[in-house]
């Protein structure tokens, strides 16, 4: 089974990696950890509004900060995988987070694990929710992680009788 862990370096992304490491797969999964740097989102407001002269240096400074955060997230993901004895590859890409994750998502027999920041309805509307986008459009199962892993005491299995 192919497993894609999408991380942004937050505690939720790290928890997703921990959940995957603890899952009892029948066979050892082919794991990839993906971090997406979305720098185009910085320019998005200026595509529809007149550009204020002098903004570009600030945008470039913010791009450098975001890229540095991405490098830190990848270094932390590498260390976390080693500490969890989870073997796999690390992938860093630039683009829109949701669509890049969907492009990299395993087909049918795979799994995408992604953290959820727990945005309220207004924030989801204003900022967009990557986990919601992935859940709605992924070609495979999606594990949304909202809390750090702990031993499971109860499991609810819901079935509607369909093949899915």
Predicted regions and their residues:
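Short, structured motif recognition centered on aromatic/hydrophobic residues
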Residues: 26-33, 81, 111, 135, ...
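Gly/Ser-rich helix-loop-strand patches that form or flank binding pockets
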Residues: 2, 17, 22, 98-149
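Small/aliphatic-rich secondary-structure junction motif
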Residues: 1-57, 84-89, 104, 152-164
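Structural beta-alpha unit
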Residues: 12, 38-41, 64, 68-112
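Residues that cap or flank secondary-structure elements
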Residues: 8, 69, 93, 122-123, ...
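Short hydrophobic/aromatic-rich motifs at helix boundaries and adjacent loops
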Residues: 46-51, 70-74, 102-104, 141-143
